[in-house]
């Protein structure tokens, strides 16, 4: 029973990932694309978490940590780019 619920959750999350990916590609503004990309990262972390529960393993926990760190740094860098036009200040 629990396995079938997890499979349904994976299908719903796959649809959510697809919608976030499409929104990232065709977002009307840069801010919409950043939010969609951040949401994509969060959904991907949840998707991997459900796979970990389905396989009853902790083997992907490092992958989840790396994706979360990259998503955080990426959203901060893109937000700074929108605000100032540059990511790194040189002076």
UniProtKB/Swiss-Prot annotation:
<keyword id="KW-0050">Antiport</keyword>
<dbReference type="InterPro" id="IPR007208">
    <property type="entry name" value="MrpF/PhaF-like"/>
</dbReference>
<keyword id="KW-0915">Sodium</keyword>
<dbReference type="Pfam" id="PF04066">
    <property type="entry name" value="MrpF_PhaF"/>
</dbReference>
<keyword id="KW-1133">Transmembrane helix</keyword>
<keyword id="KW-0739">Sodium transport</keyword>
<keyword id="KW-0406">Ion transport</keyword>
<keyword id="KW-0813">Transport</keyword>
<feature type="transmembrane region" description="Helical">
    <location>
        <begin position="34"/>
        <end position="53"/>
    </location>
</feature>
<dbReference type="GO" id="GO:0015385">
    <property type="term" value="F:sodium:proton antiporter activity"/>
</dbReference>
<comment type="similarity">
    <text>Belongs to the CPA3 antiporters (TC 2.A.63) subunit F family.</text>
</comment>
<keyword id="KW-0472">Membrane</keyword>
<keyword id="KW-0375">Hydrogen ion transport</keyword>
<keyword id="KW-0812">Transmembrane</keyword>
<feature type="transmembrane region" description="Helical">
    <location>
        <begin position="5"/>
        <end position="27"/>
    </location>
</feature>
<comment type="function">
    <text>Mnh complex is a Na(+)Li(+)/H(+) antiporter involved in Na(+) and/or Li(+) excretion and Na(+) resistance. Na(+)/H(+) antiport consumes a transmembrane electrical potential, and is thus inferred to be electrogenic. Does not transport K(+), Ca(2+) or Mg(2+).</text>
</comment>
<dbReference type="GO" id="GO:0005886">
    <property type="term" value="C:plasma membrane"/>
</dbReference>
<feature type="transmembrane region" description="Helical">
    <location>
        <begin position="63"/>
        <end position="82"/>
    </location>
</feature>
<keyword id="KW-1003">Cell membrane</keyword>
<protein>
    <recommendedName>
        <fullName>Na(+)/H(+) antiporter subunit F</fullName>
    </recommendedName>
</protein>
<comment type="subunit">
    <text>Forms a heterooligomeric complex that consists of seven subunits: MrpA, MrpB, MrpC, MrpD, MrpE, MrpF and MrpG.</text>
</comment>
